[in-house]
């Protein structure tokens, strides 16, 4: 599970930061990539990475401001010409279906793969045997959501060496034991799968704030998260301005991470007014409250390891 930041700027593209998009690479887990937001030129940013558009399985949109969605029609269209045959599901607030379908319709675009557009509310928006994705409303002046991606616990590994030591050779019986079944061997011995399975591996959690003022729902999304990705549009000296524009300061992002007991904070959605050393000041302001903080930059990668 890896994060790749395709765009980390705010509002409009800048020379050093494109507008918002984050890829959650789940290549080992499910051979796919999920995107969170898809600002203008996201597909161009992808060209500078190893991501293959055909591997993009899901796109989660936080809200419908242009710097988060203007890249969506182009990417959805281009995926048809880049080997995309598998289904693509787009999740977002009310209006995402009209926006995307209208853009594709008036441009005469016909995708060659199953495209599903789901307008979401609060609660579980996706769940399978591996992951559960939860959305909650955040404070941004228009309908907007943050997301929590929670990996389900992975069953422990079968202790093959211990089985060999008691004379149980690899074969179909291993799968039964791995499933936790009780097995009677040919020699009459009975063994229990639970005795040969290691402890489960804790699932990982990553939370996305989207654009928002500080609010309780972001804390709920980020509770005990391995990583919280939180917008930091303003420095702490502009706290009032941040509130007026429904954004957060880096200091407020850190306060949220601390109160949610997150393990790591990654700042993004950084205004073009902050360059070079000014970005370091944003990080320092956050670190004073939540030490394990970094500021993302375009193409920054972070592996979310199991703990």
Swiss-Prot record:
Gene3D superfamilies: Ribonuclease Z/Hydroxyacylglutathione hydrolase-like. Zn(2+) 2 binds at residues 67-68, 211, 269. GO terms for molecular function: 3'-tRNA processing endoribonuclease activity; zinc ion binding. The keyword Metal-binding applies. HAMAP family: RNase_Z_BN. Zinc phosphodiesterase, which displays some tRNA 3'-processing endonuclease activity. Probably involved in tRNA maturation, by removing a 3'-trailer from precursor tRNA. This is Ribonuclease Z. It comes from Bacillus licheniformis (strain ATCC 14580 / DSM 13 / JCM 2505 / CCUG 7422 / NBRC 12200 / NCIMB 9375 / NCTC 10341 / NRRL NRS-1264 / Gibson 46).
